[in-house]
Amino acid sequence: MSEQNSRPQNSERPQRSRRPQGGPRRRRKVDYIAANHIEFIDYKNTELLERFISERGKILPRRVTGTSAKNQRKVTTAIKRARIMALLPFVTED
């Protein structure tokens, strides 16, 4: 009875790879702020901040933009300040 319900051992189980076979390797995203040596992210610099906002006006996550955690916090704070000062919209119209 225990033989029927037992799990296969590690040697019997096929190994799965994290990346699909033959798939292209993903290139690591570059932190735009660090690459361009931007030390201060100003809330009045809407051209820079618009790079980190989606079409609908949402703040893009780190995994999409490639920014570091520290720079993502700076960008988020600057975007929120710009929204309060009405330099950036909270949401966009379709």
UniProtKB/Swiss-Prot annotation:
PROSITE patterns referenced in this protein's UniProt entry, alphabetically: RIBOSOMAL_S18 (PS00057)
Residue numbers spanned by region Disordered: 1-29
GO MF, any single term: structural constituent of ribosome
Recorded coiled-coil stretches: none
GO biological process, one term: translation
Keywords: Ribonucleoprotein, Ribosomal protein, RNA-binding, rRNA-binding
GO cellular component, one term: cytosolic small ribosomal subunit
Biased composition (Basic residues): 16-29
Biased composition (Low complexity): 1-12
Family: Belongs to the bacterial ribosomal protein bS18 family.
Job description of the protein: Binds as a heterodimer with protein bS6 to the central domain of the 16S rRNA, where it helps stabilize the platform of the 30S subunit.
NCBIfam families (alphabetical): S18 (TIGR00165)
Complexes and interactors: Part of the 30S ribosomal subunit. Forms a tight heterodimer with protein bS6.
Identification of the protein by name: Small ribosomal subunit protein bS18
Gene giving rise to this polypeptide: rpsR
